[in-house]
A protein has these predicted regions:
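Beta-rich carbohydrate-recognition and catalytic domains
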Residues: 1-72, 81-193, 202-243
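Active-site/ligand-binding surface loops and adjacent short beta/alpha elements
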Residues: 198-200
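Acidic-residue sensor for enzyme active/binding pockets
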Residues: 75
Length: 243
C-alpha cells in the first residue's frame, strides 16, 4: 500500500453489510516509525468498502491510537450495528513492550463508519476479541469476549447488559471477572488448548453460530492452529448445541 499506516500489513478484517455494499474494518500495521518514544510497526484500524466482496477501495484510517489506554496501538476490530450505531470493539495497547497488563478491550462508536463519535476503555483486565450479539438475548444486550488471552489459559465468556452504557462500566466488569467461571463457554477440550473469538455471532434457525480460533499444544513449540465453529443455544449462549 502507498499509505504509511498500512504499509507493513493489513489483516484480521471484520465485514459488515450495509445497503448494497460491504464495509470492512481491519487491522493495519504501519512501516517502522517513531511513536510515543519507541520505534516499531504501529497498529491502527482501517476502513475500506466493496460492492462484490472481492475488490476493495477507499482505504483510510478510522481508529488511531490517541488516548492513554490505547497509546501504543489499536488492533483487530469486530463490529456490530445496534439501533443505528456501530459498536467497534478492538484491542487497545497501553504498554510497550506489550504486556498482559496493557492489553485490554476498548470500543469505538460511530453512526456512519466515517467518523468516531466516542471511545471507551472496556475491560479493566487482560482481554481481547470482544463483540456484541446483533440481537438481544432474553431481553438483554449480550456480548462475548476472550478473557486472559495473554495470561493463559484463555476463557471465552458471555456478558449481559441492561443498558449498552454498562459495557464500559468498571464496576460491572470487576464483578463479572470475579465470577468468570460462571460466564464461561467451555470450548477447550483440555488445558493445553487456546481459544479466541473470531467473528461476531450469527443468528441461524438452529441457534448462534460462532467461529473461533483454536490452537492445540499451545504451550509447546508444536502448536497446531485451526478454525472451529460452534452452535450456541439461542436463549442460553453458554449452552453448546453442536461443534
Amino acid at each position: 500500500s502507498g499509505n504509511f499506516w498500512e504499509r507493513s500489513a493489513a489483516f484480521n478484517g471484520c465485514p459488515i453489510r450495509r445497503g448494497g455494499k460491504i464495509d470492512l474494518l481491519y487491522r493495519a500495521q504501519s512501516s517502522r516509525v517513531l511513536h510515543e518514544g519507541e520505534t516499531y510497526e504501529v497498529s491502527s484500524i482501517g476502513h475500506t468498502t466493496s460492492v462484490d466482496g472481492i475488490h476493495f477501495t477507499n482505504h483510510r484510517q478510522l481508529i488511531v491510537p490517541e488516548e492513554p489506554w490505547e497509546r501504543f496501538g489499536c488492533e483487530d476490530p469486530r463490529v456490530t450495528e445496534i439501533d443505528g450505531t456501530f459498536y467497534i470493539f478492538y484491542t487497545a495497547l497501553s504498554t510497550y513492550p506489550f504486556s498482559a497488563d496493557g492489553i485490554k478491550v476498548a470500543v469505538a462508536l460511530s453512526k456512519d463508519l466515517k467518523t468516531i463519535d466516542a471511545k471507551h476503555p472496556v475491560t479493566p483486565f487482560n482481554a481481547k476479541a470482544m463483540t456484541l450479539f446483533p440481537e438481544k438475548v432474553n431481553g438483554k444486550f449480550a456480548a462475548i469476549l476472550t478473557a486472559n488471552t495473554d495470561r493463559p489459559p484463555s476463557t471465552i465468556g458471555v456478558a449481559f447488559f441492561d443498558r449498552l452504557e454498562d459495557m464500559w462500566s468498571v464496576d460491572y466488569w470487576n464483578a463479572w471477572y470475579k465470577t468468570l467461571a460462571d460466564h464461561e463457554i467451555k470450548l477447550q477440550r483440555n488445558d493445553a488448548e487456546h481459544v479466541e473469538i473470531g467473528a461476531p455471532p450469527l443468528l441461524t434457525s438452529a441457534g448462534w453460530l460462532l467461529i473461533y480460533s483454536h490452537i492445540r499444544n499451545y504451550f509447546t513449540e508444536r502448536k497446531i492452529f485451526g478454525i472451529e465453529a460452534v452452535l450456541l443455544d439461542r436463549n442460553d449462549p453458554k449452552n453448546i448445541l453442536a461443534r
